[in-house]
């Protein structure tokens, strides 16, 4: 029975390797592609940037990120190094990252330098009237083993995870943006009620 399991495992590894090589040939050396996500947030770009660029606060809306630490001193910007404890597909890894672009309030990019290589780019664009913000997130993650097969299998799942992360970002920003307005309206509403017959 053990020999049968070993043979089955070796056969699976061989098939996985062959499929990965076939996918690599199809990609013509381009490598696994980016995963694209987008959301529109009912808040000005500066408010969205403040939440998105709060590195240590990203665990509030990226549920796959369990903890994050900034490892370099000084303000966050190009060259800032950090690491995050991430859990996806039941696998926990420490993900060291380096910020490669930091252009408030429109662009934030980083590279993944750990087990999973790749990079991510957040682009923010104000909506037509300035009260909304369009957030685009392009993320490339390259698995350490069978990268093309891993990306082909994992991309649909990661796409759903990243889209859910952006939707949580939207909900968080919109809730925080609405709180001061609701508080400010409450006294005015009470005063207006006092003037009613």
Positions of predicted regions on the chain:
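Hydrophobic pocket/interface hotspot
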Residues: 47-52, 58, 82-84, 99, ...
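Short, cysteine-centered beta-strand-loop-beta hairpins and adjacent loop/turn segments enriched
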Residues: 87-93, 143-146
């Amino acid at each position: 029975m053990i020999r049968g399991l070993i043979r089955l495992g070796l056969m699976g590894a061989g098939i996985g390797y062959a499929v990965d090589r076939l996918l690599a040939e199809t990609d013509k050396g381009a490598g696994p592609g980016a995963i694209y996500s987008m959301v529109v947030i009912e808040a000005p770009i500066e408010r969205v940037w403040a939440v998105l660029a709060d590195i240590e606060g990203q665990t509030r809306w990226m549920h796959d990120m369990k903890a994050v630490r900034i490892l370099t001193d000084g303000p966050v910007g190009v060259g800032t190094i950090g690491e995050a404890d991430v859990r996806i597909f039941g696998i926990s890894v420490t993900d060291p990252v380096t910020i490669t672009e930091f252009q408030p309030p429109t662009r934030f990019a980083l590279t993944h330098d750990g087990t999973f290589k790749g990079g991510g780019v957040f682009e923010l664009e104000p909506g037509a009237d300035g009260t909304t913000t369009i957030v685009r997130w392009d993320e490339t993650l390259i698995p350490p083993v069978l990268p093309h097969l891993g990306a082909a299998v994992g991309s649909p799942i990661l796409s759903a995870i990243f889209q859910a992360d952006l939707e949580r970002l939207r909900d968080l920003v919109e809730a925080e943006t609405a709180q001061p307005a609701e508080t400010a309206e409450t006294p005015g509403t009470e005063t207006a009620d006092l003037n009613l017959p």
